[in-house]
């Protein structure tokens, strides 16, 4: 399949080709060039990464997608999670038994499901209502719990704003048991979904009425789940769409200008712009680029357990790690206790929580000059008819993928319990993960609530639709997972749109393996060789003799320790290693385990976990 960068997805070898699988895989996947020992490099992991796996036949795949009675399996944690040695209480009760190898949701949705026997609704516990009133349960999670207890169907659907509301507002409404409730508005999807859930719950629990309602014997029927869109609403929707597109085009131009300024004295790196990704912060309508990354490779050499090597230098991953550096700076502004500095920070306190959150009217955008590798590049002509070969192709396209030496392979060919070479999940899969866990990662989750992307903008230079990205991010994980997630976590649905490309796509043979990074506050670009994970000699910024990138794990741990001191959270400083500090973030690890179990249970495959020894270092 042709990728957005003009390259083709690496063919995934399988038994149906009639050739041994190992003959087609690179050395790091256990192919013919793989060696048993790590030449000249110390490593504590010698596990054989490749395991023999058979792809089920098309008939088996179809059989799997037929509706079956739900089974009451014993609850277990995902295999990959146990290898991380993170001990969390009560997590197992939220994770279901893992079954299957291929995704079925999109196929099975087209088939009739066997209805469950009608069960009476459960009585709402007073404790649940009181917790919701006190703000201890976020509205979206509370509404999902309400629907489960009352045994009714729930859908939080995007709609159009009502009345004469103009501007870049998002609108959602809750549909509970076929009845549509009031529309919630917000500057971003998270806020509007939360407001919609609150409006519905307040009415369902009668919290907005001083006296109990008296049901009238007759009256107008409930609002239908699929309301008729009036010409006025259609006009408002059109105005909003056009307004957003103008705004998005300005953001694309802003990204172009920012990157252009950074390489003004380094024009030899202009072709690196083909893979450009950037994060943009919106404050009260004003936009600023805060993090930039480029790159198309990942480190796939032998393990070096010192935390000073960059493992994944794909553009969106590099931009996200640059964003983390921006977050650390913003948090240091907040903890400075200087009122003027705190005012500049994007973070603030929130009642009933010891975690900081983004200030009101602050939104996060992601711009990508091309589609990320993996499921986002699904062929637009694929059809999900279970009687066609396209259904089999779709199962492969929608599964989790691993990036090896810049190419993409299905995780079904990989062992999920650690490897002696470093390989990373595809950028599409990481985006899927961030839309549940947030972009902040485990370390920053000690200080802030999850931060979600409001909108994803894709340059149209070599892309004419975002169907694959929509499926990878907005359809692989169901909204129902939100009710199982810890406080503040949810299944986010970013708005996805094609925009004018910031830079035309170019073939970059001279600097193919290079990755550029920058975060707001940096004086210059840093250039990393993605193949060895170190800074290049020609990089405008150099950290020291070790040539370790400012994005590496060791650098992040150093910033984490500094922030913990400023925030006076001495308990966090007791973590002996980088790995231990991550595992101390209980809610984040719980949410991660639930997501991994969900993906595996629904047939998308196993999330490949890097060897634990990579994180067993300290400063």
Swiss-Prot record:
Testis-specific. Detected in round spermatid cells from stage II-XI (at protein level). Expressed in germ cells from mid-pachytene spermatocytes to mid-round spermatids. GO terms for biological process: RNA processing; spermatid development. Keywords: Developmental protein, Differentiation, Nucleus, RNA-binding, Spermatogenesis. It is found in: Nucleus. Disruption phenotype: Mice exhibit spermatozoa retention in stage IX tubules and a reduction in the number of sperm in the epididymis, leading to a reduction in fertility. Show defects in germ-cell development. It comes from Mus musculus. Required for male fertility and normal male germ cell differentiation. Plays a role in spermatogenesis. Binds to RNA but not to DNA. The lineage of its organism: Eukaryota, Metazoa, Chordata, Craniata, Vertebrata. It holds the Pfam family dsrm. InterPro entries: A_deamin (IPR002466), ADAD1_DSRM (IPR044455), dsRBD_dom (IPR014720). GO terms for molecular function: adenosine deaminase activity; RNA binding. The keyword RNA-binding applies. This is Adenosine deaminase domain-containing protein 1. Belongs to the ADAD family. Residues 291-617 form the A to I editase domain. Residues 138-206 form the DRBM domain. PANTHER family: ADENOSINE DEAMINASE DOMAIN-CONTAINING PROTEIN 1, EUKARYOTE SPECIFIC DSRNA BINDING PROTEIN. Residues 1-50 are annotated as: Disordered. GO terms for cellular component: male germ cell nucleus.
């Amino acid at each position: 399949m042709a990728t957005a960068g003009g390259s083709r997805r690496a063919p995934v070898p399988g038994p149906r080709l009639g050739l041994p699988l190992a003959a087609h895989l690179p050395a790091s996947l256990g192919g013919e060039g793989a060696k048993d020992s790590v030449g000249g490099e110390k490593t504590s992991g010698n596990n054989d990464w490749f395991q023999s796996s058979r792809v089920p036949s098309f008939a088996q795949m179809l059989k799997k997608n037929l509706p079956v009675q739900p089974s009451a399996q014993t609850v277990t944690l995902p295999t990959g999670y146990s290898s991380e040695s993170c001990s969390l209480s009560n997590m197992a009760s939220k994770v279901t038994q893992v079954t299957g190898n291929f995704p079925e949701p999109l196929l099975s949705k087209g088939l009739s499901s066997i209805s469950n026997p009608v069960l009476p609704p459960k009585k709402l516990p007073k404790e649940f209502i009181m917790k919701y009133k006190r703000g201890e349960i976020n509205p979206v999670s509370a509404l999902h719990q309400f629907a489960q207890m009352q045994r009714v169907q729930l859908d939080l659907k995007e709609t159009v704003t009502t009345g004469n509301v103009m501007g870049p507002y998002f609108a959602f409404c809750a549909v509970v048991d076929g009845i549509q409730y009031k529309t919630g508005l917000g500057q971003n999807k998270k806020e509007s979904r939360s407001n919609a859930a609150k409006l519905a719950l307040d009415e369902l629990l009668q919290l907005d009425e001083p006296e109990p309602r008296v049901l009238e014997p007759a009256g107008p029927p409930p609002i239908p789940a699929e309301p008729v869109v009036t010409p006025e609403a259609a006009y408002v929707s059109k105005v909003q769409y056009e307004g957003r597109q103008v705004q998005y085009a300005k953001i694309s131009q802003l990204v172009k200008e920012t990157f252009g300024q950074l390489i003004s004295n380094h024009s030899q790196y202009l072709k690196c712009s083909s893979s450009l990704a950037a994060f943009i912060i919106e404050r009260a309508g004003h936009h600023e680029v805060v993090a930039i990354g480029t790159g198309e490779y990942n480190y796939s050499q032998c393990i070096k357990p010192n935390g000073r090597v960059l493992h994944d230098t794909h553009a969106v991953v590099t931009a996200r790690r640059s964003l983390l550096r921006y977050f650390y700076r913003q948090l240091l502004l907040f903890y400075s206790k200087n009122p003027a500095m705190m005012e500049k920070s994007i973070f603030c306190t929130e009642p009933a929580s010891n975690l900081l959150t983004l200030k009101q009217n602050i939104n996060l955008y992601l711009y990508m000059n091309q589609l990320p590798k993996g499921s986002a590049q699904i062929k637009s002509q694929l059809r999900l008819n279970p009687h066609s070969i396209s259904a089999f192709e779709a199962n492969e396209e929608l599964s989790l993928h691993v990036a090896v030496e810049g190419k993409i392979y299905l995780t079904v060919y990989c062992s999920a319990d650690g490897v002696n070479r470093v390989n990373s999940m595809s950028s599409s899969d990481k985006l899927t993960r961030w839309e549940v866990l947030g972009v902040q990662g485990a370390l920053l989750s000690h200080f802030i609530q999850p931060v979600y992307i409001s909108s994803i903008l894709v340059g149209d230079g070599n892309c004419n639709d975002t169907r694959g990205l929509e499926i990878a991010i907005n359809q692989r994980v169901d909204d129902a997972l939100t009710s199982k997630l810890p406080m503040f976590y949810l299944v986010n649905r970013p708005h996805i749109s094609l925009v004018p490309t910031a830079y035309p796509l170019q073939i970059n043979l001279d600097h193919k393996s290079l990755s550029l990074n920058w975060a707001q506050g940096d004086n210059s670009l840093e250039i990393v060789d993605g193949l060895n994970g170190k800074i290049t000699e020609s990089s405008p910024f150099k950290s020291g003799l070790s040539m370790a990138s400012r994005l590496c794990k060791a650098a992040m741990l150093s910033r984490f320790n500094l922030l913990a001191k400023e925030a006076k959270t001495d308990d966090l400083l007791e973590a002996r290693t980088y790995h231990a500090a991550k595992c101390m973030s209980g809610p984040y690890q719980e949410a991660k385990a639930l997501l991994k179990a969900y993906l595996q249970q629904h047939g998308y495959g196993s999330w490949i976990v890097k060897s634990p020894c990579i994180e067993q270092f300290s400063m």
